[in-house]
Amino acid sequence: MMTQANAYFYDGADVALLNGQYTDVFSLLGMHSANEGKALIVRCFLRNALSVDVISIKDGRKVASLDKVNEQGLFAGTLGRRVKPFLYLLRVEYPLCQLDIVDPYQFDSLLNSDDIYLFGEGSAERAYEFLGANWRQTQGVEGVHFCVWAPNAKRVSVVGDFNHWDDTRHVMRQHLANGLWELFLPNVVEGAHYKFDLVYQNGERHTKSDPMATQMECAPHNASIVPPKAHHSWNDTAWMSKRAATAWHKAPMSAYEVHLGSWRRKGEQGEQYLDYQDLIEQLIPYVKEQGFTHIELMPISEFPFDGSWGYQPVGLYAPTHRFGDANGLKAFVDACHQAGIGIILDWVSAHFPKDPHGLVRFDGTCLYEHEDPRKGTHPDWDTLIYNYDRGEVRSFLLSNACYWLREFHFDGLRLDAVSSMLYLDYSREPGQWLPNAYGGRENLEAISFLQILNQRLYQAFPGVCMIAEESTAFAGVTKPTDQQGLGFGFKWNMGWMNDSLSYLGRDPLYRQFHHHQLTFSLMYAYTEQFMLSVSHDEVVHGKGSLLHKIPGDDWQKFATLRAYYGFMWGHPGKKLLFMGCEFGQRNEWNHNQSLDWHLLAYEPHQGVQRWLKDLNHLYQAMPALSVQDYEGAGFSWLDCENSRDSIFTFVRYGLAGDAPLVFVINMTPQLHTGFRIGLPLAGDYREYLNSDSQIYGGSNQGNAGTVVAESLPWQGMAQSALITVPPLGCLVIGPATGLAEAN
């Protein structure tokens, strides 16, 4: 005897569907031809439904009532007089309500063959437009298109608050050839929470956050969130045009590194983060006044653990919830641009954490990471390393970089931990790593990815800056890719940072024996396009603040810090300084609390802040400090060998017609009067800056703002002058009026 079930279903398909074991759901559910093309059949699975009617969307008329096949929620029915498929909705009667549901199983695939090809090849730049949760319209019906890459899963479902997290309700369409699963869901609203429910080959079920989610819940929750339809309206056309026309390697670039969660806080106990509107009103004016050209944001992709500072992101495409939504972030970037401030994003592409809702063994296999821990696990952080050899993983990362630059108008990316990407034996002992195909230690796949990444981004986004945190002597980090370089625009100068901070911590009495720590960097300054960085890493984990590193009493500490900044701003290369360092934060950085802004009630801290501000403004005003940063003609030592006095003198040159600037830095507390220095031009000179000025908290030793050149050759120059060099001070001297012929 034929039952209702086997009248509409075949070969136990109904049982498999109920148990969540039927994967080819589009061949079963939805509207299909029946009776050799003489009728249509509609099948659906709606738990707890009492009755289901089929309603034509075109005219709103009821077409048929479906039979209830069983009590679990299977419904089916034949539409005898209809032979051509049409758009319909299901009018569902539940015990407490009636709902109209547009059946998702009536729609064809929305994937584009070109997108699929580029994604698998590893060259997709817009994968986020078809993967993840995207608002789409098809056949006049609006909904959310869900798509995820999980080639080794037996079944993937979308679960969320729109289906009571029922894994059997919305099983996705499988594309066997490329491992993609998709489902177009009408009746989903903005802000809906969702995840992907995956059945592994071993039968285990796991729910995962969407790797391409553009919004996520705050920890400890980890659902992905359907994004809003409304988008920010940009007003930064002037900035974007200026950016595209700027050669940043010849322009002033002074970046202020910011951790948004601890720059400043609000609330009675400082327990609340500033939101993006607060940051627009407070951070941007501060950065502008201080003279920084850029803000560099520490990572803002969603991360569950505050203590990771964002360097262990789980939602690489989702701006963290901590400071607002994506449109709020866009408004913040827009406001930066309208204020003439560039904004760089710290981007983590070297590794990802093992949080179970994240990428780790995403479909039951090592999908994003390497199977072998000798290549797939990072020993320092117990995280996982991306498999850069896999096309889909390269597309995931390349598209993410493009996403931040295209959708959020960021002006560049600073790549974290590049050294760990370049070397297979990074932080590993012999036997703990696998050599490349040629027996070497270089990670050839990662190198290739970085080259492609930089090449693509510089082509697609004119004027962006790609910056590498790279701590080894790997050759060609900032060389073009057609010269076998990695193609970055800038590289952090970790050697200069380590040497100079080591020198800073030495007693002035013994600095004469370590003079080379401030001069050696000029031996290799032009091998790469360096950025001098004093980042968050130097003021945390017991290292203490910059002030804490410096020996002596308070007066000596502040004077030394000002002189150090003078040396840094005079040294060739772009600049980066971590927040709080600009006013002499005393405690090392704590990500759980605001900077110690109360210190600005005290004059020494005001003085350091004012000095840094004046350095920045001079840096922007004088081309000599930037236009030839990466040309040997832009720098000349006057005296790099005066280790006895620990005095450093050098000249910075611009192009023809630009005023040269002379720097004199004294790193001992000894006052020097009648100290002769060579000068590049004849005539009167102006003391542009003196870190020992009273306005900066100094002892007011100097040259009363004026220096007069004499026709007495000195230090390779035809002109020279006798000056007063203040203790632990920095002087910046330049022509007072006009320019004569340089020597």
UniProtKB/Swiss-Prot annotation:
State the Gene Ontology BP annotations: glycogen biosynthetic process
Reported EC number(s) for this entry are 2.4.1.18
**Record: active site:** 416 (nucleophile), 469 (proton donor)
What terms describe the molecular function in GO for this protein? Answer: 1,4-alpha-glucan branching enzyme activity; cation binding; hydrolase activity, hydrolyzing O-glycosyl compounds
The record's listing under InterPro entries reads: A-amylase/branching_C (IPR006048), Branching_enzy (IPR037439), GlgB (IPR006407), GlgB_N (IPR054169), GlgB_N_E_set_prok (IPR044143), Glyco_hydro_13_cat_dom (IPR006047), Glyco_hydro_13_N (IPR004193), Glyco_hydro_b (IPR013780)
What pathway does this protein act in?
Answer: Glycan biosynthesis; glycogen biosynthesis
Q: Which GO terms describe its cellular component?
A: cytosol
EC class: transferase
Reactions accelerated catalytically: Transfers a segment of a (1->4)-alpha-D-glucan chain to a primary hydroxy group in a similar glucan chain
Q: Which Pfam families match?
A: Alpha-amylase, Alpha-amylase_C, CBM_48, GlgB_N
The alphabetical list of record keywords is:
Carbohydrate metabolism, Glycogen biosynthesis, Glycogen metabolism, Glycosyltransferase, Transferase
HAMAP family found in the cross-reference section: GlgB
Q: Which family does it belong to?
A: Belongs to the glycosyl hydrolase 13 family. GlgB subfamily.
Q: What does this protein do?
A: Catalyzes the formation of the alpha-1,6-glucosidic linkages in glycogen by scission of a 1,4-alpha-linked oligosaccharide from growing alpha-1,4-glucan chains and the subsequent attachment of the oligosaccharide to the alpha-1,6 position.
Query: Oligomeric state and partners?
Result: Monomer.
Q: Which PANTHER family match?
A: 1,4-ALPHA-GLUCAN-BRANCHING ENZYME
- The molecule here is called 1,4-alpha-glucan branching enzyme GlgB
Species source reads Shewanella baltica (strain OS185)
The gene from which this protein is expressed is glgB
